[in-house]
Amino acid sequence: MSEIKMELIVNLIWDNEAAVWVATSEDIPGLVLESGSLDALMERTRYAIPELMALNGIDSNKLSVCYRSERHEPVIA
């Protein structure tokens, strides 16, 4: 029987003023990262999540992550 994993939501939002992607999560206390590259930011979160969860006393082996990205831009006519 497979173990049920808890799914964490990580929000990846483009900050147009700073020209960076920002990662935050209500499920992961302390997670605030930024990067100019979406791929690089996702890679950074993969390493940060287990560390932050361990600091909060949560076993990261029973977790999965759902990344949600959002970027708003004006339409160029």
Locate the predicted segments by residue:
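A short, exposed loop/beta-hairpin motif centered on an aromatic-Gly-Thr core
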Residues: 29-40
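Short aromatic-glycine-(Arg/Gly/Cys) micro-motifs in beta-strand/loop hairpins
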Residues: 14-28
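Short, charged, surface-exposed hinge/linker loops at domain edges
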Residues: 1-11, 39-77
